[in-house]
Amino acid sequence: TVFKGVDKSLAMELYKHCRKKSQITILYNSPRNGQKEFQIITDKVEFSNGKLYLYGTGLDYKQYTYFPVGRILKVLSVSLKKSEVEDIKTYKVGYELSSNSASARLCDEETIKEIKDDNTVVVEYVSSNLFMIKQKILSYGSSCKVLYPEFVKDEILQTLNSMKAGYLNGKA
């Protein structure tokens, strides 16, 4: 079931906060660091890869972020006044998708910039969370080619090379 490990009343509470774009403090059970508090200006609750996530602007790292709802223990507080979030660095990444990725779903931060004659589409993804951008690009596999910026191309290639090395080392 998709709600496995998810407190349904907590999920509904988070959904209501998202409708109001509330600023809340959550208690999160991190797999690496244990329980930790995070402040977030809520945006949406949405399914991705069969799991329910809370999305919003995290005030700790000043970037758009997401948390698996199953790891959120509770909402600790709701701020009456939202913090002004300034100096959020955003990344603009362009990539080309081939027709093999016809089932691709674009998120709110992605825009189609060009539809080419060879059945490819140029997409631009703008977000403050570079990890989310890279994760999305890698999910397309060989149907996707990063166009810009150069440092993202390099990081994607580095990730793919380390994945390849991991597979090759496993076969030794």
Q: What are the residue ranges of the model-derived segments?
A:
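Polybasic (Lys/Arg-rich)
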Residues: 87-172
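Short, mixed charged/polar active-site loops
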Residues: 34-39, 62-64
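Short acidic, glycine-rich loop/turn motifs
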Residues: 28-33, 58-61, 97-99
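Bulky hydrophobic/aromatic content
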Residues: 1-25, 29
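Short aromatic-glycine-enriched beta-strand elements
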Residues: 51-55
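Flexible linker/loop signature enriched in Pro/Ser/Thr and Pro/Gly
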Residues: 59-83
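Short beta-strand segments that buttress and anchor functional surface loops
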Residues: 26-28, 56, 125
